[in-house]
Amino acid sequence: IGCSNETTWGLTKSIAVAEREGVARYETIQNNFSLNNRRFEDELAQACRQEGVSLIPYSPLGGGVLSGKYNGGATPDGARFSNYLKLGGRQAVMARRFVNERSLASTERFGAIAGEAGMSLVTLATAWSKQHDFVASTIVGATHEDQLPEIFAAADVTLGKDVLDAINKVSQEIRYPMG
């Protein structure tokens, strides 16, 4: 049994109630977690470690932003957030959460790290997502079959300390790029 988009309080409270009532408890949590959205690490990661709950992160590519396709202000035809920006309203608000000056700046820096490490940004972002002790598996998505090789390449990648340190430096300098 799992939950999605839950808070630390909600997760720990539900576990306490399940234990009190003698019913099945949450074993997994599915939340957004990527190089551009590391809020899970603020509190939920520690709660998951203490309670034995595994994260199954979704959107490890930040809605496609971490593919680099929006770099330089590009709005690729047919891309989800390009379409959302055209629609306006609520969709545009969501798009701006993912595609903004800070997320694009961090994405470009992560891309440079990936290049120095000899891999694509997609592979770096996916490998980073799976390389946490609280992660059970990562939910990946692709709109085209040709996107899969870079994603699958991450299965065989373990990021070294120097790469992780470089990633963490970017995350410290550009805090919470998705707000």
What is the meaning of each model-derived region?
Residues G2-K169, I174, M178:
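Beta/alpha (TIM)-barrel catalytic core signal, keyed to glycine-rich beta->alpha loops juxtaposed to Asp/Glu
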